[in-house]
From Swiss-Prot:
Residues 397-419 form a propeptide. Keywords: Cell membrane, Cytoplasm, Disulfide bond, Glycoprotein, GPI-anchor, Lipoprotein, Malaria, Membrane, Repeat, Signal, Sporozoite. Sequence repeats lie at residues 99-102, 103-106, 107-110, 111-114, 115-118, 119-122, 123-126, 127-130, 131-134, 135-138, 139-142, 143-146, 147-150, 151-154, 155-158, 159-162, 163-166, 167-170, 171-174, 175-178, 179-182, 183-186, 187-190, 191-194, 195-198, 199-202, 203-206, 207-210, 211-214, 215-218, 219-222, 223-226, 227-230, 231-234, 235-238, 239-242, 243-246, 247-250, 251-254, 255-258, 259-262, 263-266, 267-270, 271-274, 275-278, 279-282, 283-286, 287-290, 291-294, 295-298, 299-302, 303-306, 307-310, 311-314. This is Circumsporozoite protein. During host cell invasion, proteolytically cleaved at the cell membrane in the region I by a papain-like cysteine protease of parasite origin. Cleavage is triggered by the sporozoite contact with highly sulfated heparan sulfate proteoglycans (HSPGs) present on the host hepatocyte cell surface. Cleavage exposes the TSP type-1 (TSR) domain and is required for productive invasion of host hepatocytes but not for adhesion to the host cell membrane. Cleavage is dispensable for sporozoite development in the oocyst, motility and for traversal of host and vector cells. It comes from the Eukaryota. Residues 50-111, 146-237, 312-332 are annotated as: Disordered. It holds the Pfam family TSP_1. It is found in: Cell membrane; Cytoplasm. Residues 81-89 are annotated as: Required for the binding to heparan sulfate proteoglycans (HSPGs) on the surface of host hepatocytes. One of its GO terms (cellular component) is cytoplasm. The keyword Repeat applies.
Amino acid sequence: MKNFNLLAVSSILLVDLFRTHWGHNVDFSKAINLNGVSFSNVDASSLGAAQVRQSASRGRGLGENPKEEDGADKKKKKDEKQVEPKKPRENKLKQPVENADGNAGGNAGGNAGGNAGGNAGGNADGNAGGNAGGNAGGNAGGNAGGNADGNAGGNADGNAGGNADGNAGGNAGGNAGGNADGNAGGNAGGNAGGNAGGNAGGNAGGNAGGNADGNAGGNAGGNAGGNADGNAGGNAGGNAGGNAGGNAGGTAGGNADGNAGGNAGGNAGGNAGGNAGGNAGGNAGGNAGGNAGGNAGGNAGGNAGGNAGANAGNKKAGDAGAGQGQNNEAANMPNVKLVKEYLDKIRSTISTEWSPCSVTCGKGVRMRKKVSAANKKPEELDVNDLETEVCTMDKCAGIFNVVSNSLRLVILLVLALFN
């Protein structure tokens, strides 16, 4: 084995010697791995030198060629130089239009936006927005909005909104809103809103709202709202709201004299004399004489005389009594379970007569057949065929007394015997 190892190492060294002289690229790692050679007895320095040379040659075998890399870099740089764009000739470039001193964007000197000198927006000198000299918005000299000189909004001289001289809104001289001279809103002279002279709202002279002179709202002279003279709201003379003379509200609202709301004299709301709300004399709310709310005489709420709320107290008492009766009835109903148990005990002897109580002391149950089930056989009977009730036995005290007395006697006898 030792001879074999020496032979393998010497073979590797010889081949490596030939490789360095003849430039052959050979990978000896595979050969070593395949043969499974052990290097335990081989000189370490020899193996180290061989591995260094082997790794260098392996790198060249994998295609690492520094010469080729240099050539590629040079070619890449050359391509980059060819891709660079050529600088354009300066004499072919278009130059931006130079503005005059103090201008922006090619305007004339002191202008903005292509306007003439001192203008804004293409206006004449000193104008804004294409207006004539000293104007704004295409108006004549000193005007605003296309108005005549000194006007606003296309109005005549000194006017606003197309009105006559000194007017506003197309009104006559000194007027507002197309009114006559000194008027507002198309009214006659000194009027407001198309009213006659000195009126407001189309009323006659001194009136408001188309009323007669001194009236308001189309009323007769001195009236309000189309009423007769001195009236309000179409009432007769001195009345309010269409009432008779001297009345208020029919007397108010079409009532008789001194009445309110269509009631009889001195009444309110269509009631009889002195009444309120259509009630009989002295009544309120349509009740009988002296009543309230349609009740009988002296009553309240539709109750009989002296009662309130349909005998609410009695009704409550009746309800309470009914509730007590229901409670008593429930208390007298025996337990269904006890009934079934007792029925099973006395099934063969039960009849239409009451049975003995199910207990001898305290509360129990007793039962009998119903008349309709009198002919039924005992085995066919059920709870629905029986009449039942709770029964109470009072023998408990007597039994207790007998037992206690007996115990006393026993105790006395025992004491006597031992003494």
